[in-house]
Amino acid sequence: MERNARLLVDLLRDRQQTDRSLGQNYLVDENVLSASIEFAGDLSGKHVLEIGCGPGTLTHFLLDANAVVSAIEIDSGSIEHMELQFSSEIDSGQLQLIEGDALSVPFPEDIDAIVANIPYQISSPLLERIQREKMHLSVIIFLVQEEFAE
């Protein structure tokens, strides 16, 4: 079975309902996902932090770009889904899942970039945390909801 954004979202939704209190709005537009990876530049071999991986739509594109991904996810149902859908990448070490709140869980120390589709309600506090931690990153790509961008 070939993975795509719509399939990953549908498989997660078959397991559980979307939790709007966690800001779970899943991105399925593969043109947007692809463009965000292209905008990030060459991620091959780079350690990328993804925040709020949800069903793995962005994760899929990061892995296809040969990034090494550490993905933080607060929702245990999404973690279980990711373990099922990306078991070979987890086994190979290309993907590490971190269950917890991105506002408080320790970030991996050796990340090169952050690429994330971040939930609206943590957008400002997350940006503040990254600025406070003075991380030395080659690139940060945040996909945000239109309301936050305005």
Where are these regions (language model features)?
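Catalytic cores of RNA-modifying enzymes
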Residues: 1-150
